[in-house]
Amino acid sequence: MVVDKTPNTLVSERAKNRVKSLVMNLILIVGSVVMLTPLLWMLATALSPNTKIPPTSLIPHDITLENFVEAWNFPKAFSPNPDHPVTMGTFFMNSLICTVCITALGIIVDSLAAYVLAFKDFPGKRLFIFLALATMMIPFYVTLVPEYLIIRKLKWINTYKAMIIPFLASGMGISLFRAHFLSIAKELEECGKLDGASDFRVYLTIVMPISRPIIGTMAILKAMWSWNQYMWPLIVCTDISKKPIQVALNMFRGLNLTEWGYMCAGMTMAILPLVILFLCAQKQFIGGLQAGAVKG
């Protein structure tokens, strides 16, 4: 039995929907303000003359780019070799090398492991799936000391290997790739096998080309995570010429004072690549998350 809604009922429902919409918009606005205020303060401080006292204004006064120039050249004072001075460009290059290697090689390792877990049956498969998921639940600080001892034993301290190799495989990456691969029709793999293709050829020419959304998502996630690494490089890297940008920002904090203008200029330069990356690839990022959530 269908009951027709009276005009008063329709008006009441529209009013409720408007109130809900207003409340949601208000929550989003408040959340945006809370999230953006620190960034606005950082940008205002970077564009204002350097000061030893933290400024309180969100509007820069006497706008200047001096802080960016000084921040770029500030590391020269800490360079162990005057003939090859260290600048912010050195730290950017270190971060770029680590980010590109972790992102590119990590996607290969995660996708290969996920392909096996999605398309192959073998003894202990469920255990490997469980272990991949379990690594997402273990805090990084639990494994920090054992990993450091291994790195020291291998004599990788102050090398790129120490900052790259431990993070090539990730439980989250394997899980997302596997979830996406499970949504792919198994007939595609079988057709490739009938044509005489090996497992690796099926993976390379059939599975990966139709997995671009999840590849894009994982590339963004891995790039953001590796670019923002702080604790691990701080521990395994004591050579200033090998430090990534996030660790190098510490030099603007002295024992008794902080160069706020230089630090905020350095932080602005440090986050700029990630902001550009996300703005250029946000559609792929959202589409990849949706694609990876089809099956578990």
PLM features: what roles do these ranges have?
Residues S12-K16, K20-G296:
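A structural signal for multi-pass alpha-helical bundles of membrane permease subunits
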Residues M1-K16:
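Short, Lys/Arg-rich, polar N-terminal cytosolic tail immediately upstream
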